From Swiss-Prot:
Transmembrane segments: none annotated. The gene is Blnk. Associates with PLCG1, VAV1 and NCK1 in a B-cell antigen receptor-dependent fashion. Interacts with VAV3, PLCG2 and GRB2. Interacts through its SH2 domain with CD79A. Interacts (via SH2 domain) with SYK; phosphorylated and activated by SYK. Interacts (via SH2 domain) with SCIMP; this interaction is dependent on phosphorylation of SCIMP 'Tyr-120'. Changing residue 373 to L: Abolishes binding to CD79A and SYK. This is B-cell linker protein. It comes from Mus musculus (Mouse).
Length: 457
């Protein structure tokens, strides 16, 4: 019955019973902990005494003195504090700072000789070099370009150095040589420019050589040679070269003056005959004379006479401009020959249109039946068309004419195509060899031989 009653007890009552049991356990544990605290020694638990410290600080010192030795407090207050602070200030600061100062000086010194590594005297003046190194970078930044130009002029500086034999003075001169020669170089670079105008004045001296008219041809080349040797002389030598052809032009127009007073047509032929003679002279002469003579012709209007002269020569020489009409004649002759060969053939339909040709092949209704007709476009590159019948379809194959080789080929231009000397050869070849037929609509290929010739009624 007791078990049944316990089962039937509602859950709320069970929870209340559990809460009471937990509360009782906590109360019992609290009593046990209080008993343990009373049994403990007052000395060791320092933390609870600090939390509940109600006594004076004097009592606390007495408690520490009773539990622990007095030797632990004295070294912290007197001996250890003094001994720990003093050595840190004396030994640590003095011994650690000097070495980095020495290393910095060692790093600076090797960098200086690299800037002047080519000079040997700088090694003895390493101590004096650092102050100069600070002043040098300001100046060499911009004159570095001129200093490179100064490298070509060390001779004047070398002449000044032997004048001062003592070595300590050489060091001072080396330092001065790095700054002063920059100014000297500017002066030395300007002096040649000042000296250059006198040779410019000598240029007209070359013009005086033109006085002898016969030797003017020989004197003109040296002026050009001098212009090639020096870049400054080019602009000035070209100026005297221009007036030099003027006297030559004065001599040579004498010949056109003889031709100009005779403008009539019969004399024009004489003028044409006289032209090749100076042309041959120009070929034998130098190119420089050609350039001088070229400006002489336009005022005399000789090229006007030269233009009508070559016009009749072009058709004679067979130039490409005139070849067009001449090639048309051989084309017509070849077509006439082809027509003569094709007229007697049973498969040649002549000027038959496409519709009538296809109707004739459909009436025959035989695979391999064919005929050849003239192309409807009347194109010289595609003069004929081969019409073939196979599998109830009619194929129109163009016959191309190749002007370069004067041969014939079937279809569009392709690699490995066959060439024939005439249309008759095409028919004879494909009567024994199959002809490939391509249907562009269905993308199909067939082949047949030309077996049955068809006539158009």
């Amino acid at each position: 019955m007791d078990k049944l009653n316990k089962i039937t007890v509602p859950a709320s009552q069970k929870l209340r019973q559990l809460q009471k049991m937990v509360h009782d356990i906590k109360n019992n544990e609290g009593g046990i902990m209080d008993k343990i605290k009373k049994l403990k020694v007052k000395g060791p638990p320092s933390v609870p005494r600090r939390d509940y410290a109600l006594d004076s600080p004097a009592d606390e010192e007495e408690q520490w003195s009773d539990d622990f030795d007095s030797d632990y407090e004295n070294p912290d207050e007197h001996s250890d504090s003094e001994m720990y602070v003093m050595p840190a200030e004396e030994t640590g600061d003095d011994s650690y700072e000097p070495p980095p100062a020495e290393q910095q000086t060692r790093v600076v010194h090797p960098a200086l000789p690299f800037t002047r590594g080519e000079y040997v005297d700088n090694r003895s003046s390493q101590r004096h070099s650092p102050p100069f190194s600070k002043t040098l970078p300001s100046k060499p930044s911009w004159p570095s370009a001129k200093a490179r130009l100064a490298s070509t002029l060390p001779a004047p500086n070398s002449l000044q150095k032997p004048q001062v034999p003592p070595k300590p003075k050489d060091l001072l001169e080396d330092e001065a040589d790095y700054v002063v020669p920059v100014e000297d170089n500017d002066e030395n670079y300007i002096h040649p420019r000042e000296s250059s105008p006198p040779p410019a004045e000598k240029a007209p001296m070359v013009n005086r050589s033109t006085k002898p008219n016969s030797s003017s041809k020989h004197m003109s080349p040296p002026g050009t040679v001098a212009g090639r040797n020096s870049g400054v002389w080019d602009s000035k030598s070209s100026l005297p070269a221009a007036p030099s052809p003027l006297p030559r032009a004065g001599k040579k127009p004498a010949t056109p003056l003889k031709t100009t007073p005779v403008p009539p047509l019969p004399n024009a032929s004489n003028v044409c005959e006289e032209k090749p003679v100076p042309a041959e002279r120009h070929r034998g002469s130098s190119h420089r004379q050609d350039t001088v003579q070229s400006p002489v012709f336009p005022p005399t209007q000789k090229p006007v006479h030269q233009k009508p002269v070559p016009l009749p020569r072009f058709p004679e020489a067979g130039s490409p401009a005139a070849d067009g009409p001449f090639h048309s004649f051989p084309f017509n002759s070849t077509f006439a020959d082809q027509e003569a060969e094709l007229l007697g053939k049973p498969w040649y339909a002549g000027a038959c249109d496409r519709k009538s040709a296809e109707e004739a092949l459909h009436r025959s209704n035989k695979d391999g039946s064919f005929l050849i007709r003239k192309s409807s476009g009347h194109d010289s590159k595609q003069p004929y068309t081969l019409v073939a019948f196979f599998n109830k379809r009619v194929y129109n194959i163009p016959v191309r004419f190749i002007e370069a080789t004067k041969q014939y080929a079937l279809g569009k231009k392709k690699n490995g195509e066959e060439y024939f000397g005439s249309v008759v050869e095409i028919v004879n070849s494909h009567q024994h060899n199959p002809l490939v037929l391509i249907d562009s609509q269905n993308n199909t290929k067939d082949s047949t031989r030309l077996k049955y010739a068809v006539k158009v009624s």
